[in-house]
Amino acid sequence: MGKYFGTDGVRGVANSELTPELAFKVGRFGGYVLTKDKQRPKVLIGRDTRISGHMLEGALVAGLLSIGAEVMRLGVISTPGVSYLTKAMDAEAGVMISASHNPVQDNGIKFFGGDGFKLSDEQEAEIERLMDEPEDKLPRPVGADLGLVNDYFEGGQKYLQFLKQTADEDFTGIHVALDCANGATSSLATHLFADLDADVSTMGTSPNGLNINDGVGSTHPEALSAFVKEKNADLGLAFDGDGDRLIAVDEKGNIVDGDQIMYICSKHLKSEGRLKDDTVVSTVMSNLGFYKALEKEGIKSVQTAVGDRYVVEAMKKDGYNVGGEQSGHLIFLDYNTTGDGLLSAIMLMNTLKATGKPLSELAAEMQKFPQLLVNVRVTDKYKVEENEKVKAVISEVEKEMNGDGRILVRPSGTEPLVRVMAEAKTKELCDEYVNRIVEVVRSEMGLE
């Protein structure tokens, strides 16, 4: 991670860390790196429903206009909506203003290249290098060569048309409850499922600039769980603030996470001969029950580091078309280039419609192993991988598990923590294994 770009673009508290001044520079230098070979490059900008979105959009637009770009403002739209439209409209770049599932005071800026994919580490490094130069030597067009800005609020409709084409048939007879996190999908999701003839009940669809992700959305699925039962819905679909994640709820109110959705969809796609190489890409944090369920269905799996960008990289490299994370970032590369909550919802609904089975029955085919994750604050998180005593206790626990469990000990990507995760046959065994390892990590390198 660099000075400005983290694991998912530039993030910070809006107007404190992520200031308009910084947003201007990100627009100017980011726009230049992505479009420098083009005369009057086209750049799309979308935002979620945060109050700070207008302020940051204004600064970003100014930065892009200063390099001569033609900016098209999409208004409130999901992150995957920007990604899709950037490629579909032959734009040189796309920008999304959002901090995803984070609280309202945060915001972020995320770029997409003309191919609809997130930037490479090298591109981000070049943007940072230019931003930190003592003198701004970028071209400064004048007169008729200055940039132009236009609104293209029809972009959302174009994206919805694309999504509707991914439905195998209409959803007549399915009662779906939607939780849109008071975010970017608040209008999109409601129209999408109504247009596909589902019976729709909604919550979290009244954004006021301040209530995004506030007790609603994919990070608070318990709210949707209660709503599904209250409305007697067949299933619930919860999106996050920028619409790139999906967590579902079955008709009984049970939460169905990203691993389960991935399993359900990949099994169905395999049965139709549409799963490339019968392989799914996931991260090391996916549940052991996920891998065992895939194995039973003859589906292979590839594991990556945590982060949807690493999942996408592995998919692109070897041509796989389904991947994702337990958190609900699910990528269907035949259709879009990034995690897409609405697209994932349609893939799940396609499966429900084709099988005629309730979501609870489909989800029950994957038996989740009890999982426990404990964070330990340490002096040097990177030393955990070479500590002999830690290695010894991990080896001891793995021997006891005898293949019926899994241990993962890794440094956090963003904080001075070591994450200790175990999965085992029972919750009691899980607790015991994690506590044994945590004890050794604390005594060897823990902070008091």
UniProtKB/Swiss-Prot annotation:
GO terms for cellular component: cytosol. The active site is at residue 100. It comes from the Bacteria. Its cofactor is Mg(2+). Disulfide bonds: none annotated. Coiled coil: none annotated. Its EC number is 5.4.2.10. This is Phosphoglucosamine mutase. Belongs to the phosphohexose mutase family. Keywords: Isomerase, Magnesium, Metal-binding, Phosphoprotein. Catalyzes the conversion of glucosamine-6-phosphate to glucosamine-1-phosphate. Glucosamine-1-phosphate is used for cell wall biosynthesis. Induction: Constitutively expressed, part of the cdaA-cdaR-glmM-glmS operon. The gene is glmM. The lineage of its organism: Bacteria, Bacillati, Bacillota, Bacilli, Bacillales.
